[in-house]
């Protein structure tokens, strides 16, 4: 990169750095960006940079591929119903071991290596997230968010720490549940009055035509996002992600972004450039 291009990049980023200093940005980390070493390192660098310029990032993660690997290694078969893993007690033990004890610490260590001050938590810690059964309760220990206690995170954020949160939480009886990480991220963003919710995915964002990669919708209003679901333009796996964004925006989050985590440094490109790279849904209209 020549000197003039470096200056151009920094000049474009500066207004956004100034705008978001001291603001909270909740990042749901998952998909290819969690699996491939180059992408993983780029995400860690992006989050560390956000923290270094005064933004307050909060990371929420799942860990589907790692869970699948360990279930196979332990010869535990998975049953899927309505697209969700039916989670019995044996499976839940593995989910909790992998998400809380392994994946969470890998993320924390990766961020700390780059100079961030990351702290690993699960939804159970300090009753940060209280779980309830998902849907009709026929999926075992698959959970939903009953309530969020953001007070757990406030002292950490005030002191410059980066909370890294696994999507495992307990119900009032102390029984652990596996909750969709998108859902946890959205509810935390609302409870923290975050400026942005960013979902790192394995798609470009919301497409006007699912068969046309050039039909990316770069910006939507809340009402338009709802209409796209109603019209079937948003369907399949994009539906729960869009609904997660809608719920967060309806509770006061300023903007939600669905971003292609397969692109190196997607996080910085979305936050600190004029064009961005994904779909931004605005909480107005």
Swiss-Prot record:
One of its GO terms (cellular component) is cytoplasm. InterPro entries: AceGlu_kinase-like_sf, AcgluKinase_fam, ArgB, Asp/Glu/Uridylate_kinase, Glu/AcGlu_kinase, NAGK-C. Pathway: Amino-acid biosynthesis; L-arginine biosynthesis; N(2)-acetyl-L-ornithine from L-glutamate: step 2/4. It comes from the Bacteria. It catalyses: N-acetyl-L-glutamate + ATP = N-acetyl-L-glutamyl 5-phosphate + ADP. Substrate binds at residues 63-64, 85, 178. It is found in: Cytoplasm. GO terms for molecular function: acetylglutamate kinase activity; ATP binding. Its main location: cytoplasm. Keywords: Amino-acid biosynthesis, Arginine biosynthesis, ATP-binding, Cytoplasm, Kinase, Nucleotide-binding, Transferase. Transmembrane segments: none annotated. The keyword Acyltransferase does not apply. Its EC number is 2.7.2.8. The record marks 28, 241 as: Transition state stabilizer. GO terms for biological process: arginine biosynthetic process via ornithine; L-arginine biosynthetic process. Belongs to the acetylglutamate kinase family. ArgB subfamily. Catalyzes the ATP-dependent phosphorylation of N-acetyl-L-glutamate. HAMAP family: ArgB. NCBIfam families: argB. This is Acetylglutamate kinase. The lineage of its organism: Bacteria, Bacillati, Cyanobacteriota, Cyanophyceae, Synechococcales.
């Amino acid at each position: 990169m020549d000197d003039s291009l470096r200056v151009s990049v920094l000049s474009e980023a500066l207004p956004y750095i100034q705008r978001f200093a001291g603001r909270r940005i909740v990042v749901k980390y998952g998909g290819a960006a969690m699996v491939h070493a180059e992408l993983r390192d780029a995400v860690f660098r992006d989050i560390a940079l956000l923290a270094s310029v005064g933004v307050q990032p909060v990371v929420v993660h799942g860990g589907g591929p790692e869970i699948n690997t360990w279930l196979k290694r332990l010869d535990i078969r998975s049953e899927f119903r309505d697209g969700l893993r039916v989670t019995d007690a044996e499976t839940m033990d593995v989910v909790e071991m992998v998400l809380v004890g392994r994946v969470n610490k890998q993320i924390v260590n990766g961020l700390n290596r780059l100079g961030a001050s990351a702290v690993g938590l699960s939804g159970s810690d300090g009753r940060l997230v209280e779980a309830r059964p998902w849907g009709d309760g026929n999926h075992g220990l698959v959970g939903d968010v009953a309530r969020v206690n953001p007070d757990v995170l406030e002292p950490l954020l005030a002191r410059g720490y980066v909370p890294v949160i696994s999507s495992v939480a307990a119900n009032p009886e102390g029984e652990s549940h596996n909750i969709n990480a998108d859902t946890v991220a959205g509810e935390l963003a609302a409870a923290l009055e975050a400026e942005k919710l960013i979902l790192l995915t394995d798609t470009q964002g919301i497409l006007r035509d699912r068969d046309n990669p050039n039909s990316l919708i770069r910006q939507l209003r809340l009402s338009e996002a709802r209409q796209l679901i109603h019209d079937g333009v948003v369907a399949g796996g994009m539906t729960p992600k869009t609904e997660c964004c809608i719920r967060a925006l309806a509770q006061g989050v300023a903007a939600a972004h669905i971003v292609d985590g397969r692109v190196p440094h997607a996080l910085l490109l979305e936050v600190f450039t004029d064009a961005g790279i994904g779909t931004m849904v605005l909480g107005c209209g």
